[in-house]
């Protein structure tokens, strides 16, 4: 009886079909802000994929100050150009040219994104502005000291 059980187990338990992984590999990106030289408009973005291939988006603006990934978007603060650029992230990198939002000469610096709103600090205007990511309008300005 044991021999019969072991024989059946071996016949049923073995498969000649190899296991195939049908999942697609999704490209993941690391984004690096390259500030550039003040006044030279040569700030850039480096993109590194999960194969360690490096790509560059040149001449993004004058002083690429900071950036952040939020959902399927890359949000880039460009200080001396006084703009924020928003790019869609795709499998191939960034969808260019992106959307450019003027900050009205505020010299934006750092950002954080909460609930589809970008809160960014400003050197010239000494405030925190709030950018709505649905309509790309600056909704409000919050004065701060310093």
Segments from the language model and where they lie:
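N-terminal hydrophobic targeting signals that begin at the initiator methionine
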Residues: 1-2, 15
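Sec-dependent N-terminal signal peptides
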Residues: 4-12
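Predominantly soluble domains enriched in secretory-pathway, periplasmic, or organellar proteins
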Residues: 14-146
């Amino acid at each position: 009886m044991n021999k019969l059980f072991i024989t059946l187990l071996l016949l049923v338990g073995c498969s000649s079909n190899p296991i195939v992984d049908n999942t697609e590999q999704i490209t993941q990106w690391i984004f690096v802000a390259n500030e550039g030289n003040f006044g030279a408009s040569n700030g850039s973005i480096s993109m590194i994929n999960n194969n360690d291939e490096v790509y560059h988006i040149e001449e993004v603006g004058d002083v690429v100050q900071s950036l952040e990934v939020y959902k399927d978007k890359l949000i880039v603060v460009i200080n001396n150009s006084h703009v924020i650029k928003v790019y869609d992230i795709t499998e191939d990198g960034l969808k260019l040219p992106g959307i450019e939002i003027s900050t009205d000469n505020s010299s934006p610096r750092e950002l954080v994104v909460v609930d589809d709103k970008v809160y960014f600090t400003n050197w010239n205007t000494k405030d925190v502005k709030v950018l709505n990511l649905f309509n790309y309008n600056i909704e409000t300005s919050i004065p701060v000291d310093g």
